[in-house]
Amino acid sequence: MSVALSFSGYRHRKRLVRSAVDWFVSNFLGKYQLEIDIEDRGLNREGLYGACTVLDKNSRPREFLIEMNNTLDDVAYLSTLFHELIHVKQRVLGEFKTKYDKDYWFGKLIDPDTEYKNLPWEVEAHQLECGIMELYLDELNV
């Protein structure tokens, strides 16, 4: 496992983020060399808890920006962080791809008119985020 992590935000959150990202990458993306920048900032105006953006290339991406809403409490923050890390996993493993501005989920073209909440990568991330957070907290004995 190799992840280069940069973080802008509060010291307490930096420790939380480092631990969670290291755990997630070692459990789900161990063989990949990744660069993940995490920006902790106010996203209330945008109406977001978090966002994940590919920074390098859409084919075999390895560099990501995760923006996190710094007004969330620690539980919501951690859940959102795992949600965004699930998107990193989806991109790295090729489950969710974008080719020529068209989105594919496991090789199937996704209708561009699909509502956000029904996009398959969002459905999966919402389904998994709390369970992954519970696994993480159990391993920490929190």
Outline where the language-model segments fall:
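Hydrophobic or amphipathic, alpha-helical segments that drive membrane association/targeting
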Residues: 1-12, 34-47
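Long, well-structured alpha-helical subdomains associated
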Residues: 115-118, 129-142
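Zn2+-dependent metallopeptidase catalytic core
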Residues: 12-33
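Post-HEXXH active-site segment of zinc metalloproteases
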Residues: 75, 91-123
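Soluble non-cytosolic domains of exported or imported proteins
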Residues: 11, 15, 75-76, 80, ...
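Catalytic zinc-binding patch centered on the HExxH motif and its immediate surroundings
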Residues: 39-63, 74
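Short pre-active-site segment immediately N-terminal to the catalytic Zn-binding motif
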Residues: 63-81
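Active-site recognition of the HExxH zinc-binding catalytic motif
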Residues: 79-91
